[in-house]
Amino acid sequence: MSKLEELIEKLCPNGVEFKNLQYLCGTITTGKLNANAMEDNGLYPFFTCDSNPFKINTYAFDEEAILISGNGSQVGHINYYKGKFNAYQRTYVIYDFKEINVKFLLHYLNGYLKEYILRNCKKGSVPYITLPMLQKFSVPVPPLEVQCEIVHILDDFTLLSAELSAELKARQKQYQFYLNNLLDIEKLKPQKIMYVKDLFEIKNGLNKEKGAFGKGTPIVNFTDVYKNRYLTKNMLKGKVTLNEREIKRYAVEKGDVFFTRTSETKEDIGMSSTVIEDIEKCTFSGFVLRARPTTDLLIPKFCAYYFSTNKVRDTIIRYASFTTRATTSGPKLAKIPVPIISIKEQEKIVNILDRFDKLCNDISEGLPAEIEARQKQYEYYRDKLLTFKELKVNE
């Protein structure tokens, strides 16, 4: 019998009590700042709804805390931090923990919060967290000795995953270096430089009532574009009910380049993704813009790589508008310069970058495959170790 099994047999053989999150921490609040309050080279972490914190020169919290993205493409993403930090007004900050090991709670939230959010949000809407929803999230509360032993086991898995992820991050940095250099306009010495307005027709996406989502025609959503440099049919999970007129008007074709239209932060505005294969009967969301090629001067994969270079990203950010959110539009994207080189040269660059892409992103081999395997192993043990029989209060 393992140490954990002995502790459970001794301390909670009949099950454990489940409690709502509001009873396990003294404070569940949000930050007060706009998402664009970050400062370059700031002294403190600034947590927004992005997966990684930015920097800022002021702090509003000095706590051991769990931070949860309240909306946006990373809704439900969880960070842990101990020390001085600041937070965006839609980022939840949880601290002053009672009866619960903060790392135990962290593992449990990572396992079950996102599913809970999707189950409790309004169908068809962009998922977001409300305070009552978070307060009512139910958590098993075994004795602290049991919690600590579970944390010890699961932390070993996450440590190994973190080491592998750090190695992959270094490889991705190298990949981005080659991407930026191979697609640098000055180094390419193009035949000529044109602009997006000369090469594409830009159109806003489809807006439908909430009840139309969930079945029907595949749809390119915000998250599909935000997370992927290029798109294939198998990557699309969302569906929407359309009539024939809408299917024709908001169609998706091979070579279409999509850009995210809004963002919580300026760094994430105008993320792009290119359709690299034919997709029959597909549409696109109003949260993205479609740039359809009007010439045959560019191949899809070249577009996929070019529009993700640092210089293009800088151009998109420079022309974007900022209020409480960052926004872009067709006329702003139209100003992006595009180098025109031969198809043969484009294919040569694509072949080089495809090899880097496979090394960094192909989950069937190398580091990505090992990270995927370790993550699945962690999730298996997390689900196994965090599953408890509920002990009723009167038992």
Identify what each model region corresponds to:
Residues I8-G31, A37, N41-L43, T48, ...:
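Non-catalytic DNA-recognition/assembly elements of restriction-modification systems
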Residues C12, S125, E209, E246-K248, ...:
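Short, conserved secondary-structure segments in the cores of folded domains
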Residues T48-N52, I56-K114, K122, T130, ...:
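A short beta-sheet element
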Residues Y81, F104, N110, E115, ...:
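Long compositionally biased, domain-poor regions of proteins
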